């Protein structure tokens, strides 16, 4: 068990560290006993740069393009978690708990799509592409860049709604100080030509660079569907 302080309300929160919902290289995801709609992301080794970056993110959240549908398109930090050992260091944050969604690769892979969601048609793929573009546009409007665009960070529902996760890996630009907190990672297949063979930790991403991964993420599932259609009809 670990006790951490939840800001800005200054309440102490007890997290059970023996059972995690997921584990990554930098952090683990845990349930929040007092709220089933939230999860806590706790860093293995908190860094000072994360403190400032998360504070900027909390102060300047993007718009939610599917708020009218009661859906969360971007799993954004909602509250910061601080250590109670007197250091006041940020150890993680709370964010919405996302349920009933799968990685986008399960939908643009025909075999897994038939297995998990057999009624997910071509029209749903088009709707997924549109919703993904809307989520990216909402981030870009606030100056954020996803950076690490990959299939694991894009979740899709059975009704083609999209949620972006791992948002603390995004490139963040402080609108007040103009400091840029870069995204040091990325997948080659979603990296635009001008950033290939570059050290991401040394590069400021720009919104225009994400026309490439956005197009890739939108049209890969569509053309995979069409290629299967063409193989079965062009005989």
Show where each model-derived region lies.
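Amphipathic alpha-helical segments that line or abut small-molecule/effector binding pockets
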Residues: 123-137, 141
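Conserved structural core of kinase catalytic domains
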Residues: 72-127
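Catalytic-loop of the protein kinase fold
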Residues: 136, 140-157
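ATP-binding glycine-rich phosphate-binding loop
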Residues: 2-49, 71-72
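Activation segment/activation loop of eukaryotic-type protein kinase catalytic domains
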Residues: 152-189, 193
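Conserved end of the kinase activation segment
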Residues: 194-207
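The N-lobe alphaC helix and its flanking beta3-alphaC-beta4 segment of protein kinase-like domains
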Residues: 45-70
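Conserved C-lobe activation region of Hanks-type protein kinase-like domains
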Residues: 210, 214-235
